[in-house]
Amino acid sequence: MSAVIENHEHDHHGPQKGILRWLFTTNHKDIGTLYLWFSFLMFLTGGAMAMGIRAELFEPGLQLMDPIRYNQLVTMHGLIMIFGAVMPAFVGLANWLIPMQIGAPDMALPRMNNLSFWLLPSAFIILLSTAFMEGGMPGFGWTFYAPLSTNYPNIAYFVFAVHIMGVSSIMGSINVIVTIMNMRAPGMTLMQMPLFVWSWLITAYLLIAVMPVLAGAVTML
C-alpha cells in the first residue's frame, strides 16, 4: 500500500519554469533577487539622470536643457534613487538574509512578499509615464514646495505612485515583523538575534509609522 502511495506523489508538479517562476514565486531568495535586480535597474536609470544633471552643470549657462527639464531631472533622480534603488536594495538583502539568520525556512507571509515586490514596478511605470504627459515629469525638486508641486496633472500620478510604494513598504514591513517575531529558531531569543535582524525589526516598525504620514502629506499637495 505504501508503494502505491509513493507512486502517486506529485512527480510532475515541480517548480514553475521560466518567466512564471519569477512572476509567482514565493521563495524568499527569488524575491530578494528580484528586489536586487530591480534596484540595479533603477540605479542605472537614476544614474543616467545624474549624468544629465552633471553634464548641464559642466559649464555656466544652458547646455543641454531648459530650467524646467533640469528641475524635472533633479526631482526624478531623487525619487528613483531613494525609492527605486536604495530602499529595494535593502529589502532585497532583508529577504535573502533574515530567514537564514533566524533559522526560518522562508518569510512568514510569502504571497504578500511576492505582491509587495510587484507593486514596485507598477509604481515606477506610473511615475515614469509622466514624461509623456502635459508638462512632463514632476519638477518640484526633493522638497515638493508649492507652487511647483501644484501644477499639471502629472502631480496626481506622482501622488498615486507614492501611495503604491507606501503600500508595498507597509506590506514588506509587516512581513518582516511577523517573520522575526514568530519564526525564529527554537531557543533563539530576541537578544540572541544578529544586529542585522534587529536593525530591520526597528526599521519595519518605523516604516509602518512613517509611510501613512508621507502618504497624507503628498495627498495634500
Name each model-derived stretch:
Residues 2-221:
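Membrane-embedded and interfacial regions of multi-pass energy-transducing membrane proteins
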